[in-house]
C-alpha cells in the first residue's frame, strides 16, 4: 500500500506542475508549446539528478525512488502530449517545426538528463 501511495502522490504533484507549466508557457510559442517542452526538459534534468543521487544511496527505501522517479517525474514529463503536438504539426504540413520540435524534445531531454547527472557529480566532487 505504501508503494501505491508513493506513486500516486508523486504523480499527482508532477501532473499539477506540468499543467501549470502548460498554462503559463504554451501560449508563448504555439507551434512548439513551451510548457510541454519545459516539462520534458525539467523532467530530464531532474531524473538525471535523481538517478545519480539514488545510485549513491542504495539503502534508501524503494518508495523514495518510486515517489520521485515513477510518480513525480512520470507525472511531470509527457510523451503523449509531445506526440500529439508533433502529429498536429505533421497534419498541418509544418515539417520544419516538426523536425525542430522532435530535435528539441528528444535531444534536449537526453541532454538535460546528462546535465543532471553531471551536476550531481560536480556537487559531489566540490562538496567532499
Swiss-Prot record:
Identify its membrane topology class.
Multi-pass membrane protein
| Keyword terms of this UniProt record | Cell inner membrane, Cell membrane, Ion channel, Ion transport, Membrane, Metal-binding, Sodium, Transmembrane, Transmembrane helix, Transport
GO MF terms held by the record: fluoride channel activity; metal ion binding
List positions binding Na(+): 74, 77
Summarizing activity control, the record says: Na(+) is not transported, but it plays an essential structural role and its presence is essential for fluoride channel function.
What catalytic activity is recorded? Answer: fluoride(in) = fluoride(out)
Q: Per UniProt, what is one Pfam family of this protein?
A: CRCB
Q: Which domain of life is it from?
A: Bacteria
List the GO biological process terms: cellular detoxification of fluoride
Question: Could you confirm whether the keyword Cell membrane appears in this record?
Answer: yes
Q: Subcellular localization, per the record? A: Cell inner membrane
User: Where this protein primarily resides, as one coarse class?
Assistant: membrane
GO (cellular component) term, any one: plasma membrane
So where does this one cross the membrane?
3-23, 34-54, 67-87, 98-118
Instruction: Give the record's family classification.
Output: Belongs to the fluoride channel Fluc/FEX (TC 1.A.43) family.
NCBIfam families reported in the protein's UniProt record: crcB, PRK14196.1
**Function comment:** Fluoride-specific ion channel. Important for reducing fluoride concentration in the cell, thus reducing its toxicity.
PANTHER family listed in its UniProt record? FLUORIDE EXPORT PROTEIN 1-RELATED
This protein is called what?
Fluoride-specific ion channel FluC
- The gene name on file is fluC
Amino acid at each position: 500500500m505504501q508503494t501505491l501511495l508513493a506513486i500516486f502522490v508523486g504523480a499527482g504533484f508532477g501532473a499539477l506542475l506540468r499543467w501549470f507549466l502548460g498554462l503559463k508557457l504554451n501560449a508563448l510559442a504555439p507551434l512548439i508549446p513551451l510548457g510541454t517542452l519545459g516539462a520534458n526538459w525539467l523532467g530530464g534534468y531532474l531524473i538525471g539528478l535523481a538517478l545519480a543521487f539514488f545510485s549513491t544511496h542504495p539503502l534508501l527505501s524503494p518508495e523514495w525512488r518510486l515517489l520521485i522517479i515513477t510518480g513525480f517525474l512520470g507525472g511531470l514529463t509527457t510523451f503523449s502530449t509531445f506526440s500529439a503536438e508533433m502529429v498536429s504539426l505533421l497534419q498541418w504540413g509544418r515539417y520544419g517545426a516538426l523536425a525542430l520540435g522532435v530535435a528539441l524534445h528528444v535531444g534536449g531531454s537526453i541532454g538535460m538528463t546528462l546535465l543532471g547527472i553531471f551536476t550531481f557529480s560536480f556537487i559531489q566532487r566540490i562538496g567532499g
